[in-house]
Amino acid sequence: MSAESETSSNVTAEAMNGDGATPLVSVIVPVYGVERYLDACVEGLVGQTYRNLEILLVDDGSPDRCPAMCDAWTARDERIRVIHKANGGLSDARNVGLAKATGDYIYFVDSDDMVERNLIERAMATMRDYDADLVMFQFDTISEDGKPLTSSYKHNHYDDVIIMTPIEAIKAQVKAEIDGYFWSFVAAASIYRNHGFSFPVGRKIEDMARICNVIGESHRVVRIPEALYHYRMRRGSITGDWSMQLTRDWVRATDDRETYIVERFPELKNFMKLQQLIFFVNLDYETIRQSLVAKFSIDPQDADRIRRRIEGLTKDVAGAGDEVPESTQSLLDTMKQTFAEMVEPDVGAEA
């Protein structure tokens, strides 16, 4: 028996593509343990005003009713294909979906979230109007039962269309001025296919690890000021379950990002050193804060590695003549004292 199986209607990719005048968009939806939310997500996709879609539901070995629910959708809409596979995690499911996708453009959706019905239409119109190959949009948040969450805080809010070069967009993303989620943009499939793209399997924070790889291979990025995606706030999400392993995944993700950026755009080397310093200082602070809230122990070896990393980055930034932001310097001074208190007792014990 094959590790993967696929369910679909009899319609072919060529039929979905029509005469080629309207680009085919592949929507990739990893599915695992979301039977409560899956139908609402898929309904938003099949109801898109942009009709030329293939919707890939990748069942990642879900233990609930999701596999049967996915199969049932193929009888309701001929554009839906279902891939059943053994559980491998979000990145693995995305990679499988990407390998199976036949569209001219790629869009990833999380199966517990919801989308506006004009999301693809707005993205594709923007691609055409601005000769772009990557279009980003805003998002808002909904509760577990799908109700809008109102807040005066709007993350990375903007009111006008923003046109960016890849380098401009990368710098904005690294500075957290652009959201680092794969569901926050539609991109040309060639960006993925022509550069050997894949998500890192077996890790969290996979979006940060790879988003700049996509941005960097585009030729024009356009951001539109519309909230087209609805992110569902659920208990037990990654952000609500901090651990030392999650901290390690954050470190690996930002290292992956830096490696790609510096190799692809060497002129950003000094910029990345400063941004890495800012990132690690803030990550450290948040790890210690979360350890107090969640009551988990910080591994002294991890603490020592991060301390040494910050020391090295501090020297690199000073050597380049760059100025550390005042807020980061203040936090850095506090963290140095905290590290000394955490690491020195263990060193003394070994002596």
Residue positions per predicted region:
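Membrane-interface aromatic/basic loop that binds lipid-linked glycans or pyrophosphate carriers
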Residues: 1-12, 16-17, 132, 292-351
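N-proximal low-complexity "stem/linker" segments adjacent to membrane-targeting elements
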Residues: 1-46
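Acidic helix N-cap motif at the loop->helix transition within catalytic regions
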Residues: 39, 53, 64-72, 84, ...
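Glycine-rich, basic loop-to-helix element that forms the pyrophosphate-binding segment
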Residues: 85-101, 114
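Catalytic core of nucleotide-sugar-dependent glycosyltransferases
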Residues: 227-234, 241-268, 283-318
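A conserved acidic beta->alpha catalytic loop
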Residues: 44, 51, 59-68, 86, ...
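Short aromatic/hydrophobic "clamp" motif used to bind/position activated sugar donors
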Residues: 106
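Donor-binding/catalytic cores of nucleotide-activated saccharide
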Residues: 111-222, 233-242
